[in-house]
Amino acid sequence: MCKQEYVFRGLGISLSGRGRVPETESMEPLPLIVAIHGGTYSSRYFDVPGYSLLDRAQAQGLPIFAIDRPGYGISAPYAAHAPSILDNAEILDSAIQDLWHNYPHNASGIVLIGHSIGAAISIAIAARQPSWPLLGIALSGVGLDPVSASKDKWNSVPAQQALVSVPPEAMDGFFFGPPATYDHAVMPQASHAACSPAPRSELVDIGMHWPKQVYRLAAQVKVPVHYRQPEYEQLWPVDEATVQRFAQAFVNCPAMDAALFRDAGHCIDFHRMGEAFQFQQLAFARRCVANA
């Protein structure tokens, strides 16, 4: 499998990213996986050595791409346009359509894996009923309404500041669980390579507008959903009941697999249980193909 960096095109906007492409064509129907990162991280979130979803997909022979969203990577200047969650969905819908038609494959369809704001965007993409074959969405680090402290933090950033840079050390306190849940020899330091300035607009949007949009968007999702919310989540209220309330918003979803994920914080991937979590997501992607 070939490990490469890529440039994707969405509504005429160039978006950077990375991927793993099988070197030989499989006779087995496979999902084409597209990973969508959250706020303050680039697509490298999914490719931190030792914690890489891309590497684990590669080990299973699954084609996978992670796209730098508008305002990240080579499209960082686009942050000046104040992209919202819905803007992200529209642009990425176009970029994924381009990917689907230009990548030579025998994939049965596409499965989105979205984290945090990337999970909200994945829901918004699914709600658009895209023209390319969407088979399912796997979500984590998102809910119905963020905690008040998270909203207040971003609202205080001046509106004229297009990009927000958060010191990695400050992010660690919000994104990781208790010390026993991650390997101190590696994390959180290794995650800092994936940190990136984020468009202020999306950070405000997830707190101010997402709670008003989520029920409408979730009701328009008509593909299977895999949802895991970490036990030590600090950006969203979390317990078994809130996980189920979120799942119940997907009233037209044909299959829902929702659960509280133990022993991890917001960035589940970077915890000791990250490998098990990613295996669950990849297994879900395969089930989407089997049930298509």
Question: What are the functions of these language-model segments?
Answer:
Residues 261-274:
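Catalytic histidine-centered segment of alpha/beta-hydrolase-like enzymes
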Residues 151-239:
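Alpha/beta-hydrolase
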Residues 30, 37-42:
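Active-site glycine-rich loops that stabilize anionic/oxyanionic intermediates
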Residues 53-76:
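Conserved alpha/beta-hydrolase
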Residues 231-264:
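Conserved loop-alpha-helix segment in the C-terminal half of the alpha/beta-hydrolase fold
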Residues 40-53, 239-241:
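The serine-hydrolase catalytic nucleophile loop
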Residues 1-25:
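N-terminal cap/lid segment of alpha/beta-hydrolase-fold proteins
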Residues 89-108:
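Conserved acidic catalytic loop of the alpha/beta-hydrolase fold
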